[in-house]
């Protein structure tokens, strides 16, 4: 409707002036001007916009480097010749992109309260100068300012987001159309060589957004790839489906017999929400229509959906595991659907070619995929941990289970965290700086990344191990899809710095919960296995303690099935099933399902002996029937020594009694451990260290 009105308004002068062109004034700063381009007259966003709009429009560039929106700023736009020229030209459409230079400490701290009034005054000046035209005004959210801007942490970062909020308020207050120029560029730092100015490719993205806003052409009806035939819709919660269509288009949806409709917004986005459904074992259909196009999804199941993520031990496939034959022999009778996000190129010991490097920069990292019904081939190539987790859920709950896997070998946890969260974190923001030389990031990750991208000539070349990258390519595209929770197997690429990982992990969980707008979303993870790497005992114990700090978060032990030299143990079925036990007990309320091995509650001195009490065990025993191994004690000043269960200690139900007094107790503290403590369910105890009190 808004474009119909605009067309009618514009039609009057067109009729009178015999096909007079529609004038588009691009008002702005150096980004509009095309600063940094070899030839702005050919590659600036207004020039590219002209090419997109065609001969029916005349686009002019009124950008001036350093211009501020604030009239008391260091270079007010209203005092510049470009402003006067734009007013005199009498445009039909005005696209305003100002505010970046107002983040200067000379401007925003002093005159922020005048921003709203100054912005409104510029808008009204275009209208007042030519009241017969009343030009259409587009207000733009600013393009990004990235972390390597010289003033990023000293104020620019925070003032930038404050200005973005003001701009949004201005658009709402005057019912002006808002164009979000950060929408696509915020995840493309490779297009901003100086952290501020988009290169020609970035300018083309801006031009495309402005083109779509002016013409309402957003490419017609489209949905994220996560929606497809065979998908599993999360039971028990309303199902929201998102997509894009041409602005103002009526979007109609039908989920079986339930109908719903909406209108695509000014930015082309829309969403439809359908009533919550329960699993019923039936096949369902969803149909979406808009812009003369119809998209239908069939064979949809209602059930449980889980995200399965991390690095190579989560990506480790069923066909590589020691349980391959048993896994494939038992796929019948379970309805498990797989959404398997495989990378276009693996982070192997190779140099990637130019095609791969360009694809990574454009976020074309994961191979496009669809939901698949389980069969021998699909299961063979799917994550072994994830599949065994899903199989146990399907058996126990009796409902279809959908598994989304986006794990990437070698990936550090920080690559899965969203950019805004990291940018605003007082410590983790430093991960972003020169990440390929940054010792906050594991040296192996940096070395492998350097090898993979050795052929790139772009100093801002992207890589899956870069902070935020896997969030932008592997989490953001599926964030619209309702899930029950997440399972996570990762840590090998963060084990170099236990204390830093604790901060990263807490931030990761928080990032995902905000992404899915679910502060209590369950997050279950695998504690690292055992291997001859010195830092791993400390890391495993840190993971144990992390689980006690984060609500609705818990871990599964895997140190009992490690390997002294292979970081990829092949025993994956027990790991997936231990994760499933956590979900069944805690999330699904099946409290009879044992979820943990013996867990230390306290250690104290009694009658000259050291007593350790455990929960999650009526009787402590061993996995191999031999004497208990792996327990160590230390005196007040001495080192740790092994406890001999032949002569020094005994097991009494859920207690261990050690002769003499100790000050600290450790268990399974060797990098590769043969510790063998389990409970009556056969579930192993975690690595731990506790103080005797």
Regions found by a protein language model. Name each.
Residues 219-247, 298-308, 315, 586-602:
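Non-catalytic, glycine-rich low-complexity segments
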Residues 242-326, 397:
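Extended acidic/polar, glycine-enriched regions
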Residues 259, 611, 617-693:
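C-terminal beta-sandwich/jelly-roll accessory domains of carbohydrate-active enzymes
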Residues 225, 234-237, 574, 581, ...:
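Surface beta-strand/loop "capping" patches
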Residues 21-26, 31-120, 299, 305-307, ...:
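Conserved SGNH/GDSL esterase-like catalytic core that processes O-acyl groups on lipids
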Residues 26, 339, 346-381, 484-493:
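Short, conserved helix/loop micro-motifs enriched in His/Cys and acidic residues
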Residues 1-20:
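Bacterial Sec-dependent N-terminal signal peptides
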């Amino acid at each position: 409707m808004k474009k119909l009105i605009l067309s009618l308004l514009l039609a009057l002068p067109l009729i009178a002036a015999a096909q007079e062109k529609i004038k588009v004034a691009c008002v702005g700063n150096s980004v509009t001007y095309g600063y940094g381009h070899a030839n702005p007259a050919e590659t600036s966003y207004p020039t590219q916009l002209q090419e997109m709009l065609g001969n029916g429009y005349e686009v002019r560039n009124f950008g001036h480097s350093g211009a501020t929106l604030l009239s008391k700023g260091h270079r007010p736009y209203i005092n510049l010749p470009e402003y006067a020229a734009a007013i005199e030209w009498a445009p039909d459409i005005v696209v305003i992109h100002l505010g970046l230079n107002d983040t200067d400490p000379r401007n925003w701290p002093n005159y922020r309260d005048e921003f709203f009034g100054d912005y409104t005054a510029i808008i009204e000046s275009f209208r007042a100068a030519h009241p017969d035209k009343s030009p259409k005004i587009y207000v733009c959210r600013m393009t990004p300012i990235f972390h390597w801007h010289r003033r990023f942490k000293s104020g620019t970062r925070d003032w930038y987001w404050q200005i973005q909020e003001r701009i949004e308020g201005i658009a709402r207050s005057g019912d002006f159309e808002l164009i979000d120029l950060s929408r696509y560029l915020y995840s493309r730092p490779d297009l901003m060589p100086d952290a501020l100015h988009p290169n020609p490719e970035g300018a083309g993205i801006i031009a495309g957004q402005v083109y779509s806003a002016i013409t309402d052409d957003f490419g017609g009806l489209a949905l994220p790839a996560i929606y497809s035939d065979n998908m599993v819709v999360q039971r028990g919660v309303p199902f929201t489906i998102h997509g894009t269509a041409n602005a103002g288009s009526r979007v109609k949806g039908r989920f079986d017999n339930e109908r719903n409709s909406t209108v695509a917004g000014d930015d082309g986005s829309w969403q439809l929400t359908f009533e919550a459904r329960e699993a019923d074992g039936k096949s369902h259909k969803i149909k979406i229509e808009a812009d003369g196009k119809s998209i239908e999804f069939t064979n949809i199941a209602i059930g449980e959906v889980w995200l399965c993520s991390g690095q190579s031990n989560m990506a480790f496939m069923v066909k590589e595991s020691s349980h391959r034959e048993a896994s494939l022999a038992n796929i019948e009778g379970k309805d498990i659907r797989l959404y398997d996000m495989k990378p276009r190129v693996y982070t192997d010991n190779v140099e990637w070619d130019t095609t791969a490097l360009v694809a990574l920069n454009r976020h074309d990292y994961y191979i496009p995929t669809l939901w698949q019904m389980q069969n021998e081939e699909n299961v063979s190539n799917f994550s072994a941990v994830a599949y065994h987790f899903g199989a146990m859920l399907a058996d126990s709950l009796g409902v279809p289970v959908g598994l989304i896997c986006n794990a990437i070998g070698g990936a550090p946890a920080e690559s899965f965290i969203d950019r805004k969260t990291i940018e605003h974190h007082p410590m983790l923001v430093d991960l972003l700086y020169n990440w390929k030389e940054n010792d906050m990031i594991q040296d192996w990750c940096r070395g492998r990344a350097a090898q993979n991208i050795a052929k790139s000539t772009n100093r801002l070349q992207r890589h899956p191990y870069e902070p935020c990258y896997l969030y932008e390519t592997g989490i953001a595209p599926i964030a619209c899809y309702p899930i029950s929770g997440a399972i996570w197997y990762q840590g090998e690429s963060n084990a170099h710095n236990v204390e830093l990982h604790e901060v990263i992990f807490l931030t990761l969980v928080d990032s995902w919960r905000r992404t899915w707008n679910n502060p209590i979303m369950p997050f279950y993870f695998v504690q690292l296995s055992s291997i001859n790497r010195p830092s791993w005992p400390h890391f495993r114990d840190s993971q144990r303690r992390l689980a006690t700090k984060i609500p609705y978060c818990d871990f599964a032990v895997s140190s009992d099935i490690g390997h002294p030299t292979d970081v990829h143990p092949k025993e994956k079925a027990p790991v997936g099933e231990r994760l499933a036990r956590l979900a069944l007990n805690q999330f699904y309320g099946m409290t009879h399902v044992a979820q943990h091995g013996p867990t230390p509650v306290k250690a104290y001195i009694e009658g000259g002996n050291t007593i350790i009490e455990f929960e999650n065990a009526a009787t402590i025993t061993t996995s191999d029937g031999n004497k208990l191994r792996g327990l160590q004690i230390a005196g007040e000043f001495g080192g740790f020594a092994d406890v001999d269960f032949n002569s020094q200690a005994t097991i009494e139900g859920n207690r261990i009694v050690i002769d003499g007094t100790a000050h600290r107790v450790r268990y399974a503290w060797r990098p590769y451990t043969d510790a063998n403590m389990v409970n009556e369910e056969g579930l192993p105890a975690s690595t731990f260290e506790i103080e005797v009190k």
